[in-house]
Curated annotation (Swiss-Prot):
Residues 119-138 are annotated as: Disordered. The keyword Membrane does not apply. Monomer. Binds 30S ribosomal subunits, but not 50S ribosomal subunits or 70S ribosomes. Keywords: Cytoplasm, Ribosome biogenesis. It holds the Pfam family RBFA. GO terms for molecular function: ribosomal small subunit binding. It is found in: Cytoplasm. PANTHER family: RIBOSOME-BINDING FACTOR A, CHLOROPLASTIC-RELATED. One of several proteins that assist in the late maturation steps of the functional core of the 30S ribosomal subunit. Associates with free 30S ribosomal subunits (but not with 30S subunits that are part of 70S ribosomes or polysomes). Required for efficient processing of 16S rRNA. May interact with the 5'-terminal helix region of 16S rRNA. It comes from Agrobacterium fabrum (strain C58 / ATCC 33970). GO terms for cellular component: cytosol. This is Ribosome-binding factor A.
Length: 138
């Protein structure tokens, strides 16, 4: 009988993803990556998602104070092999060091869109004061 596959990440995937995120953050904070684009930019790593076999780590990053993120993301992907090698001492329990992939994190942009939508006059009108007396009488 085949095991049912779940789309939710396992506890192990979440734990390893958080360890990789912390290690990458330290590598970037210490300035170990020698690239003008990366050195002059504050980069926030919001999440690292691991593949089920733990061989691929996709890091979602947000370069702060930069309008166009594509150059920074490209620079991070160019230095992915170097950073993978620097993960070794911090992730000694791993049998294989995961391949690193960097992607632009759009969750903050989505948050801003939802916030703007909730603050729009049309939605505010619908969310206006409710009749609490009607609720209490029923």
């Amino acid at each position: 009988m085949a095991k049912a596959t779940s789309s939710a990440p396992s506890q192990r995937m979440l734990r390893v993803g958080e360890q990789v995120r912390a290690a990458l953050t330290q590598i970037l904070q210490r300035g170990e990556v020698r690239d003008d684009l990366i050195e002059g930019t504050v980069i926030s790593i919001s999440e690292v998602r691991m593949s089920p076999d733990l061989k691929i780590a996709t890091a979602y990053v947000t370069p702060l104070g930069v309008a166009d993120h594509t150059d920074i993301i490209s620079a991070l992907n160019r230095h992915a092999k170097f950073m993978r090698g620097r993960l070794g001492p911090q992730l000694r329990q791993m049998k294989y060091m995961p391949e690193l992939r960097f992607r632009d994190d759009t969750s903050f942009d989505n948050y801003q869109k939802i916030d703007a939508l909730l603050r729009s006059p049309e939605v505010q009108r619908d969310l206006g004061p409710s009749n609490e007396k009607d609720d209490e009488q029923n």
